[in-house]
Each structure stands twice: as structure tokens, then as C-alpha cells.
């Protein structure tokens, strides 16, 4: 029986703490113990790696996991949850092929050193989320921001500040 079949995470840097969440969800949370403050109204969104393997092949480092947004919307006494993967080329193509196709921070594509040597790591858009310049942006240090729609969390696409962002990287750890 494989480690995955036993429920063991094969990525040594994860120490068993991170597992895939393959499904996207959209539902009202019914099971709340106690009550929520009536003036708790708003939305909290977080970003993080939602997938640590593709098919049976684990990524080499948890930094390479595909970005997943998790959104909690509070409306007085109710909470709604929605999660969505950010549809980067890496996510779309690896999901379709069910194999690793992009080099990452700690993940090599098949083919050895020469195949990986001049390839920059893919941008999994998995580090943070900010609202800046009227845009909701998913960030990663290894690439440009990815714009997503507030509320639906649908991916709009890579955002380059209307051509003014010339580089291929962007800080994902902004301070306010």
C-alpha cells in the first residue's frame, strides 16, 4: 500500500501537516456552536497552497502547492464558506494532465538537471491576497499578481498594472 493510500503525506518538508483539498465548496455553515455577534458582518479571505500533489506525485516543497482562496462571509447570525483554486496555467495544465509539468521552488520537472536548468519556478499564486488599486490580487514571490473577482473568487487573469509592471516577480508579503 502506498503512503498516499495510507494517508501519509510524502513531502518531507510538510511533516504530514498538509494534504490536498481537491474539491471546491460553496455552502452556508449550519453547524455553529453558540452564536455569532450580530454586528459581525463582512468577509475574510485567506490564500494558501491547496494542493500538495498531482496524481500520485507529491510536489517537492509545500511552497509549490497551487493557490486556493478560502472565503468566510459573515452576515450577522450566518456564515457562508466558498473556496476556489486560482486558475493559473500551472493549475489548469497540471489538473488536465494529472502530472507535474512545471518546475517549482522545490519541485523539478521530469528530465533531470538540464531540463530544469533555465526554467524559472512557476507562479502558483499561493502566498497572500490583497485589495490594491481596486483589484483583488492573489500573490506569490515568483510571479506577477493574479486578479480574482471579489465574492465569486473567479480568476480574471495575470495582472501587470496595465503594462506598467515590467518585471516577472512581485512581493507577496506587503505591509500596510
Map each language-model feature to its residues.
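Beta-propeller domains
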Residues: 1-176
Amino acid at each position: 500500500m502506498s503512503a498516499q493510500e495510507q494517508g501519509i503525506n510524502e513531502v518531507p518538508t510538510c511533516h504530514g501537516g498538509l494534504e490536498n483539498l481537491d474539491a471546491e465548496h460553496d455552502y452556508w455553515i449550519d453547524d455553529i456552536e453558540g452564536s455569532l455577534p450580530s454586528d459581525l458582518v463582512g468577509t475574510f479571505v485567506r490564500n494558501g497552497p491547496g494542493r500538495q500533489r498531482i496524481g500520485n506525485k507529491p510536489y517537492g516543497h509545500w511552497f509549490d502547492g497551487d493557490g486556493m482562496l478560502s472565503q468566510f462571509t459573515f452576515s450577522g447570525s450566518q456564515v457562508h464558506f466558498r473556496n476556489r483554486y486560482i486558475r493559473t496555467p500551472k493549475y489548469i495544465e497540471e489538473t488536465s494532465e494529472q502530472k507535474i509539468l512545471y518546475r517549482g521552488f522545490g519541485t523539478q520537472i521530469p528530465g533531470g538537471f538540464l531540463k530544469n536548468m533555465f526554467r524559472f519556478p512557476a507562479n502558483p499564486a499561493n502566498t497572500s491576497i490583497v485589495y490594491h488599486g481596486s483589484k483583488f490580487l492573489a500573490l506569490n514571490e515568483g510571479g506577477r499578481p493574479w486578479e480574482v473577482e471579489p465574492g465569486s473568487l473567479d480568476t480574471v487573469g495575470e495582472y501587470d498594472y496595465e503594462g506598467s509592471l515590467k518585471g516577472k516577480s512581485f512581493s507577496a508579503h506587503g505591509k500596510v
